[in-house]
Amino acid sequence: MAKKSMIARDVKRKKMVERFSDRRAALMAAFHAAKDPMERLEIHRKIQGLPRNSAPNRVRNRCWATGKPRGVYRDFGLCRNQLRERAHKGELPGVVKSSW
C-alpha cells in the first residue's frame, strides 16, 4: 500500500490538471502557431507562469486498489500483483490464464 500522502498528492494533481487544461491547451496552440520568436517567448513565459502541477505529465498512474505507482496495467488500472490475484479469483471478466 502506498503512503496516503502520495495518493492524496496525486489526486490533487489530477484536479489541478483538469482545472487548467483549457488554459494550457490554448496557450500551447498559440505557442505552436506563433512564428515570431519574441511572441513565442512571451507565450512561453505565460505557460511557465501556470502552476507546475497543472502539467499532465506530473500525474502518476497508480493502482486504484493499492495506490502502488509501478507495474500498473492501463487497461485495468491495477498493479501487476492485484491483477494476478483478481484474475485467479475470477473477478476480471474475460481474463483467462494462458497455456500453450
From Swiss-Prot:
Q: What Gene Ontology molecular function terms does this protein carry?
A: rRNA binding; structural constituent of ribosome
The superkingdom listed in its UniProt entry is Bacteria
Which biological process, per GO, is one annotated for this protein?
translation
Q: NCBIfam families under this entry?
A: PRK08881.1
Subunit structure and binding partners: Part of the 30S ribosomal subunit. Contacts proteins S3 and S10.
HAMAP family noted in UniProt: Ribosomal_uS14_1 (MF_00537)
The protein's job, in short, is: Binds 16S rRNA, required for the assembly of 30S particles and may also be responsible for determining the conformation of the 16S rRNA at the A site.
Q: Which family does the entry's similarity section mention?
A: Belongs to the universal ribosomal protein uS14 family.
In Swiss-Prot or TrEMBL terms, this protein is called Small ribosomal subunit protein uS14
Task: Give the organism the record lists.
Answer: Synechococcus sp. (strain CC9311)
Gene name linked to the record: rpsN
